[in-house]
Regions:
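Cyclic nucleotide-binding regulatory module and flanking cytosolic helices
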Residues: 1-28
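Tight coil/turn sites that cap or link beta-strands
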Residues: 27, 32, 68-71
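A short beta-loop-beta micro-motif enriched in histidine and acidic residues
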Residues: 30-40, 60-61, 79-81
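Glycine- and acidic-residue-biased ligand/ion/polar-headgroup-sensing regions
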Residues: 38-55, 71
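Cyclic-nucleotide recognition modules
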Residues: 62-117
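Short, Lys/Arg-enriched anionic-surface-contact patches
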Residues: 65, 70, 79, 128-141
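Phosphate-/nucleic-acid-contacting segments
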Residues: 136, 143-180
Length: 180
């Protein structure tokens, strides 16, 4: 049986000997896998996207909201309420039920530190993304990703990247052509 690469998740500040690691179950996933509801995941390998279905027009469209790379953690709540989590590539994750996470908070108050850290990171990232979307053009957003998050450009398929910055794939191609 494989074990979690704890160094990859050292930013969570959980001791290597902490029994919490034993509660995670290994999940190998393939491309286009939809992750189960009411669980938290640690991504060890692969790439996962979070998206919403926009059905305000005649055609349903997918709007990419976030991406998760190795070392990231994400939680999936009730189906559809918080978006859909789908793998972009095959990979490996570690899962734990949200009920088990709640139990850990009761048994071990130190887990609250991890929760607070995770929530503050999520809030800061959401606020930063909102400001980027409000204050910048799609070309500015693409240039920001080029300079600050090149791993997005290198790893995320263009159709998902276009959705993330709020343009069509054709518009993204034009932006890329103007920049180069």
């Amino acid at each position: 049986m494989a074990s979690i690469n704890k160094k990859l998740f050292s930013h969570l500040n959980v001791e290597d000997s902490d029994p919490v690691w034993e509660k995670f179950a290994e999940v190998e996933f393939s491309k286009k896998n939809i992750f189960s509801d009411n669980k938290a995941y640690l991504v060890e390998d692969g790439l996962v996207r979070k998206y919403y279905i926009n059905n305000t027009s005649d055609i349903d469209t997918e709007v990419c909201a976030e991406f998760y790379f190795p070392g990231d953690i994400f939680t999936v709540g009730t189906h559809g309420s918080e978006g859909i989590f789908e793998s972009i590539s095959s990979g490996l994750a570690w899962e734990i039920t949200l009920d088990e996470v709640k139990e850990m908070f009761v048994v071990n108050p130190e887990c609250r530190f991890v929760q607070n850290y995770y929530l503050s990171r999520k809030l800061n990232a959401a606020m930063k993304r909102e400001m980027l979307l409000l204050k910048n053009t799609p070309q500015d957003l693409y240039e920001y990703l080029l300079s600050h998050k090149p791993h997005y450009i290198q790893n995320i398929p263009l159709k998902y990247l276009a959705s993330y910055i709020g343009v069509t794939p054709i518009s993204l191609s034009r932006i890329r052509k103007r920049i180069s």
